[in-house]
Design a protein with these regions (language model features):
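N-terminal secretory targeting modules
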Residues: 1-66, 71-77, 91-97, 224, ...
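Conserved SGNH/GDSL esterase-like catalytic core that processes O-acyl groups on lipids
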Residues: 62-64, 70-153
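Alpha/beta-hydrolase-fold catalytic nucleophile elbow
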Residues: 132, 171-172
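Feature marks short, surface-exposed loop/turn motifs that line or immediately flank catalytic pockets
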Residues: 23, 109, 137-139, 174-177, ...
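Alpha-helical scaffolding segments of alpha/beta enzyme cores, especially the outer helices
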Residues: 146-149, 153-157, 196-203
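Conserved beta-strand segments of alpha/beta enzyme cores
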Residues: 99-101, 167, 209-211
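Catalytic His-Asp segment of secreted/periplasmic serine-dependent ester chemistry enzymes
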Residues: 175-254
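A short helix->loop->beta-strand "cap" motif at the edges of active sites that frequently abuts
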Residues: 161-167
Length: 254
């Protein structure tokens, strides 16, 4: 046997032993480790782990998020918006939900959102629909009765877009007076007005059999927790939106 064949057999023997060693690393061992969460990032947009075969899977439930700056996520990246983080929280807890379809713009009042819905060509119905609207009605001193009338009109549109009962969520209006932007304003007056609008929202949800979640109290923590506000000193940071997402998941889905 020449030297080349001896070296070749030696290499093969070492390789075989290494591959069959009980200490060799198995991918499933890594991915099951709670401290190893790279899949949380790589699977964010797809809503699944990269080691899952989704080629033959059924499409996950659809999600339509309606609102204003608080839904579009003014001042944060798209993946930090509360609807996107809500999907992440759901997926992490084993409930697959598709990435959100968002109809929202900074500055929108109820009738702006209503007009946008009227002008949108919807091609399907949705499994989950959220509504977070009203802060700009309050900020611009619009009558609360106008707000209530618009809510009824919005619900008519939403009912035509939902797949089933129990799928619509009403979210309370955050208290922007607790942000640095509201520091030199009458915070008590702002809170009183926000509470009035939210009482109307909660009553509206109860009358129509809709789920309701309060994120206002989370927003009021911003007075003592500046990291809950983004760099514009007004809108929530991704951290606050994560707090919302967790609470919304527990109330709406879990």
């Amino acid at each position: 046997m020449n030297l080349f064949k001896i070296l070749k057999l030696t290499y093969f023997f070492i390789f075989f032993i290494a591959c069959s060693s009980p200490n060799s690393i198995d991918y499933e061992d890594i991915i099951s480790n709670e401290d190893y969460c790279e899949w949380c990032e790589s699977g964010r947009q797809e809503g699944s782990r990269p080691d899952q075969d989704t080629s033959n899977s059924i499409s996950p439930p659809s999600f339509l998020a309606l609102g204003d700056s608080y839904t579009i996520g003014e001042g944060v990246n798209g993946d930090q918006r509360w609807p996107n983080q809500f999907v992440d929280v759901a997926n992490y807890n084993g409930i697959q939900i598709d990435q959100p379809i968002i109809i929202a713009e900074t500055g929108w009042k109820t009738y702006d959102l209503l007009n946008a819905i009227k002008q949108t060509n919807f091609t399907k119905k949705y499994d989950y629909i959220s509504l977070l609207i009203g802060v700009n009605n309050q900020f611009n001193s619009r009558p609360i009765n106008e707000f209530k009338d618009d809510l009824d009109k919005l619900l008519t549109k939403i009912n035509n877009l939902k797949k089933k009962d129990g799928s619509v969520l009403i979210i309370s209006i955050p208290d922007w007076g607790s942000s640095p932007f509201g520091e030199n304003m009458d915070r008590n007056q702002i809170s009183t007005e926000i509470n009035s609008f939210n009482n109307s929202l909660k009553s509206f949800a109860n009358i129509n059999g809709l789920k309701y979640v309060d994120v206002t109290e989370i927003s009021r923590r911003a007075i003592n927790e500046p990291n809950l506000i983004t760099s514009d000193n007004l809108h929530p940071s991704g951290l606050m939106y994560l707090e919302w997402a967790k609470k919304i998941f527990n109330v709406w889905i879990n």
